[in-house]
Amino acid sequence: MIEWSDRGIVLAARPHGEDGVIVSLLSAGHGRHSGIVRGGRGKRLRAALQPGSLVQATWKARLEDHLGSLVVELLAGVAGGLLDDRDRLAALAAACALAETVLPERAPQADVYDATLALLDALAEGGEGTPLVWAGAFVRWEIGLLAALGFGLDLSCCAVSGECGDLAYVSPRSGRAVGREAGAPWQARLLALPAFLLSPAEVPANAQAVGDGLRLSGYFLEGHVLAPQGRGLPASRQRFVERLRRWSAADR
């Protein structure tokens, strides 16, 4: 019998059999990992199996490549505190679905786990009046996810001139930053680089910048990570993006 215990973030749960649930976790030390939770459709475990819940999990299986079983205990829930804020709830659903879609199974992803915990904290703390803080955190989380998957963007210096100031674009081909002046002739072909990704402590995000950031990360997630596998971005992420477009419209 193989067994491990670890903390994990619930990414998804789907019914299995009469009362069971197949749960997908992003665990601290074992990466994205799935298992069957017996009785998972009952009221006792309902809160623990909501996407975004932090749980203590014990996984057991006879062989390493078996699906195995999971026993989970709720440590902290996030979704319940977001029920009155559909934007943050949409962000939570998008993050969990995206991690479930793009992360390889059973590959340790300690940095992604830590970054996802930080995102959940930002969502939990980001009530009315601070939406752009957590929305900016979501964009930075997606950029970090790209890096963890081997498709990190190089936002250090201009790919054309080599200068490291006034960066305004990203090349869709190379994923490298391009300066404002150097990129001006090809502006229509380049992706906008929001300034808050370069200096988050100095430049606050606004609605337009968040939208640009989501287009930037979404372009590379879809084109470089998912398209080669014949897949697209999760529908929940698209719904989240649509919700945030209302912010930009309200700012006009």
UniProtKB/Swiss-Prot annotation:
The lineage of its organism: Bacteria, Pseudomonadati, Pseudomonadota, Alphaproteobacteria, Rhodospirillales. PANTHER family: DNA REPAIR PROTEIN RECO. The keyword Disulfide bond does not apply. GO terms for cellular component: bacterial nucleoid. Belongs to the RecO family. This is DNA repair protein RecO. The gene is recO. It holds the Pfam family RecO_C. The keyword DNA damage applies. GO terms for biological process: DNA recombination; double-strand break repair.
